[in-house]
Amino acid sequence: MFVGEVVGNVWGTRKHASLEGKRLFLVRPIDPVTEKPAGEAIMAVDGGVGAGPGSIVLVMDEGNSARTILKDKKAPVRAVICAVVDRVTAGGTVKRYA
């Protein structure tokens, strides 16, 4: 699980049936306090939280847990956006996003 920033949309001419109606995004891991990039962007499915480009989100990056969030055990998914982050508190520092 990591905090990331939605940096783009992903489009496909064909989708697996379990992904119909779901939005796909590129999410780059970030340090939640400094907002500095912490890795390469990955594709993640919006788990119904209403994320969009520029959103700071919480990503479940483990296939079985991601499929559980989507309630579809056969979905070909590794990462799902499970929350939009409002704020992070770490080491006495509070970072607000909303």
Model-based region annotation:
Residues 43-48, 60:
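Histidine- and aromatic-rich ligand-binding microenvironments
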Residues 58-60, 64-98:
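C-terminal structural segments of small proteins and small subunits
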